């Protein structure tokens, strides 16, 4: 364990006090909203509609960041508030109750499958190095989400969820598995 009691740099950020948890909760939700705003803005942009490859890459990055943030929320707090999209201007979808995490995973899987199709491999494009979200990272995150959705995340009482393990996602039909099997 880390002797640093003022930071949250331990393995998987397990050390936290009440202030730290509140800050983390707010910052992760801020990331989901910012990523959702980016996804919405990119999808509605003229450049994306005209087939800009850069906008396609940016969409993949935004989808990945949104999925990563929601997975982190679910991993840390279980059932959380979730919305698929941006906040309405009248704020009617801002203050929402939490929903079952098993209802969130299909959205994350859908987003990650789209992100995998949008992103390049590391080194495939000039500025896409290990410091950018790449196809390899997106495939790894998709696999992690699939594990959690299939029941890998243990629930209260150390029992697996009632989730259908075979359902998330069918790896043989997953576009990312072609490279893995070769």
Region locations from a protein language model:
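Short coil/turn linking the two alpha-helices of tandem helical-hairpin repeats
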Residues: 74-81, 123, 148-157
